[in-house]
Amino acid sequence: MKNKTQKNRILINKEVYSKEITKKFLKDITEKILSELNLNNVEISITLTDNERIREINKEWRGKDKPTDVLSFPQDETIGYKYRLLGDVIISLPYAKAQAEEIGLTLREEVLRLLVHGILHLLGYDHETNEEDAKIMFDLQDKIFDKLTCEL
């Protein structure tokens, strides 16, 4: 249930064009994800980019010279700032589109899935450490995805 008094700051940067994935769609679906996670008064940055740019970022920050679907960069708390800084989620739209076709989702569904995944990483969830942590993260991701898919 969305709280009308909720005040989040959602910054959207689209480096690639998509008629289907608009800034409004990204902002609205991010707000719903934050609401599902009971997060209020947070700031988050969402960037849609291409495979080449995400490859560069992946190489620089993770040492992996290849494109990927989503990257997350958590922020440190800033004392005295109006919002709790969650961090940045970067999604490769071409990668997401190819992945959606491969697994049988619409592009909007795949972007939703990647946003949930990225935001969970910002909150400290991890699926690469051990199977137990992976199960916790993916169960929550699936729960939020399943609930919000019908609202697309």
From Swiss-Prot:
Binding site for Zn(2+): 117, 121, 127
Cofactor(s) listed in the protein's UniProt record: Zn(2+)
Keywords for this protein: Cytoplasm, Endonuclease, Hydrolase, Metal-binding, Nuclease, Ribosome biogenesis, rRNA processing, Zinc
The family this protein is said to belong to: Belongs to the endoribonuclease YbeY family.
Cross-referenced Pfam families: YbeY (PF02130)
Gene name as annotated: ybeY
EC assignment: 3.1.-.-
Cited SUPFAM superfamilies: Metalloproteases ('zincins'), catalytic domain
UniProt main location, coarse: cytoplasm
Cofactor note (record): Binds 1 zinc ion.
Keyword rRNA processing: yes
GO molecular function terms noted in the UniProt entry: metalloendopeptidase activity; RNA endonuclease activity; zinc ion binding
Species of the source: Sulfurihydrogenibium sp. (strain YO3AOP1)
Protein name listed in UniProt: Endoribonuclease YbeY
Summary of the function given for this chain in its UniProt record: Single strand-specific metallo-endoribonuclease involved in late-stage 70S ribosome quality control and in maturation of the 3' terminus of the 16S rRNA.
Main enzyme class: hydrolase
Gene3D superfamilies linked to this entry: Metalloproteases ('zincins'), catalytic domain (3.40.390.30)
Entries under InterPro entries matching the protein: MetalPrtase_cat_dom_sf_prd, YbeY, YbeY_CS
Keyword rRNA processing part of the UniProt annotation: yes
Superkingdom in the source lineage: Bacteria
Subcellular location as annotated: Cytoplasm
GO cellular component annotations of the record: cytoplasm
Gene Ontology biological process terms in this record: rRNA processing
